[in-house]
Amino acid sequence: MQLPDDLRDQLKNPLGNLVSDNDPNKENILKKISADTTLITVGDRTTENMLQLGLKPQIQIIDGLEKRNQRTVPTDDTINTKLSCRNPPGEITEESMQVIQKAFSCESPVRITVDGEEDLLVIPVCIHAPENSIVMYGQPNEGLVIVTITPEIRAKVQKILDIMN
C-alpha cells in the first residue's frame, strides 16, 4: 500500500498529544503513562529516548535511520523477541502488517527492525495495539507524539489505511 500525495499533509497532524522538542522532560512523558500500560515506540530516536528515561517499550520499531540518515541502533539488552520486515519509504507492506500483528503475541520486549522506513508503521500499530496502549512516535522537527489507543484512533487510522489500499 502506497501513501497517496493527498494524504501526506493529513499525516503531518499528530494522532495524539504532542510533547514539544523544547520540553522533553521525564515528568511530561511519564505522567501520560501508567505502569500497567502497553507501550509501543516507533522510531529510533523515540525508542532510544524512552529507554534512556528508564521506560521499557513492549514493542520497539526501528530502522537504523533518523531523518533518512544512518544512525546507531538504540541499545536494549532486555529484548526477548527480534523480528524484521521490509517496508519501503512511503509504503505499508503486507509483510510489515503481519509482523506487527505477530509482535503483539510474542514475548516482550519485542524489537522489529525494518529494512526501509518505519514511519508509516504507526498506522498498523494503532490498529493492532490493545485498547488503552500508548504508542509513541516522533513528529519531525516538532517533538514526540503520544497516542492512547481508543476506538476513535482505530477508526481514524483505519480510514487512512483504506485510502492507501
Predicted segments with their positions:
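Short hydrophobic/aromatic-enriched beta-strand-loop microsegments
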Residues: P57-G64, E131-Q139
